[in-house]
């Protein structure tokens, strides 16, 4: 499965009500480090059926970024049962992102 674009209208259903852990990637198109993380996140989404992967564009969804206290991007957040269980800022290699799960 590919990563899902998360916004205010689908956040509750896709993230909070998910029966799988959710990896959220807070990003923006102008962010260089974000562009390095996007292909890794997409690859994880395709490889792992046991998790859901969502991308949140902070320019289009500032309220979600604020809700998670995102101060710099990329920020990766892992949610389970509607709760944050892991969070990391900055570009990371695939192994470090997988270790968050």
Where would I find each of the regions flagged by the language model?
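Conserved Rossmann-like nucleotide-binding pocket used by diverse enzymes
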Residues: 2, 7, 27, 52-54
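A short beta-strand-turn-helix
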Residues: 3-22, 62
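Residue-level signature of catalytic and energy-coupling elements of molecular machines
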Residues: 11, 24, 41, 57, ...
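Short pre-active-site segment immediately N-terminal to redox-active cysteine/selenocysteine motifs
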Residues: 19-20, 26-30, 72
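Conserved helix-turn-beta segment immediately C-terminal to the redox Cys motif
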Residues: 19-21, 36-56, 60-62
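Structural micro-motif
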Residues: 22, 68-77, 92-95
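Conserved redox-active cysteine motifs that mediate thiol-disulfide chemistry
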Residues: 26-40
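Non-catalytic, surface beta->alpha helical segment in thiol-disulfide oxidoreductase systems
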Residues: 77-101
């Amino acid at each position: 499965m590919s990563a899902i674009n998360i916004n205010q209208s689908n956040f509750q259903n896709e993230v909070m009500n998910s029966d799988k852990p959710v990896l959220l990637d807070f990003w923006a198109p102008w962010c260089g480090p974000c562009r390095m993380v996007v292909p890794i996140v997409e690859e994880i989404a395709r490889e792992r059926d046991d998790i859901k992967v969502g991308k949140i564009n902070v320019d289009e969804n500032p309220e979600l970024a604020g809700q998670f206290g995102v101060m710099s991007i990329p920020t990766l957040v892992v949610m389970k049962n509607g709760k944050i269980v892991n969070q990391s800022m900055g570009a990371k290699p695939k192994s470090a992102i997988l270790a968050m799960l």
